[in-house]
Amino acid sequence: MPKVQSSQVVLDSAYRCFCRNGFRRTTISDIVEEAQLSRPTVYKYAGTKDEAFAKVVRVRLEQAATAAGEAADAARSPEAKVLGVLTVKLEVAIRLWDDSPAHAYELLAAASAHTPDLVAAYTDHLARLLASALDEAAPDAARQAADVLLTFTRGLEDDLRDTEAARLGLRTGVRMITSGALSRPVILPA
């Protein structure tokens, strides 16, 4: 099997194992069995369980970051750009919940604990996309609004039992938050 194909098989197998067993209960033996490759081949492409997990997280976040950038580029209005970026973020969480309803919380926590730099880089990328979308209309509030929008979306990701309600909540929240960020700022007394 060619290198790229073997590497992809190993990472796809690792993802399925993490989704099925959770982070704590997945072993390299599980990944070897799922990939139907030799143990040395799995170690070559995945490394340890922690390294395999980090590689899976990296690939998933890189794909999501690319999709978020494309969504922002395709949209015409600041609100549509924001909604496009945050829809990508929410859909990543929905996919994880669909793939691993029993272990989604654990996997999200493991990603934050075991790959904090990857998660932070992804979040920063999204914040820059959001701030850029809002910057022309609201340069003073763009980064703050981006942070609020990301926090709001993380809140929606906490309970994805009803994905349509989460999607509707995202659209409603984006409309409300961006309309506030894009309106003339109100200066409150100190």
Predicted feature residues:
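Hydrophobic alpha-helical connector segments
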Residues: K55, A68-R95
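Amphipathic alpha-helical segments used for helix-helix packing
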Residues: A80-G84, V92-D117, L150
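Helix-turn-helix
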Residues: V9, S13, C17-E51, K55
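N-terminal intrinsically disordered/low-complexity leader segments
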Residues: M1-Q5, P185-A190
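Amphipathic C-terminal alpha-helical segment
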Residues: E91-L96, S132, A142, A146-R167, ...
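Amphipathic alpha-helical packing segments from all-alpha helical-bundle domains
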Residues: A65, A111-A137, R143-D147
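Generic hydrophobic, amphipathic alpha-helix propensity
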Residues: Q5-A14, I31, V56-A68, L130
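Hydrophobic/aromatic residues within well-ordered alpha-helical segments
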Residues: K49, V56, R60, A64, ...
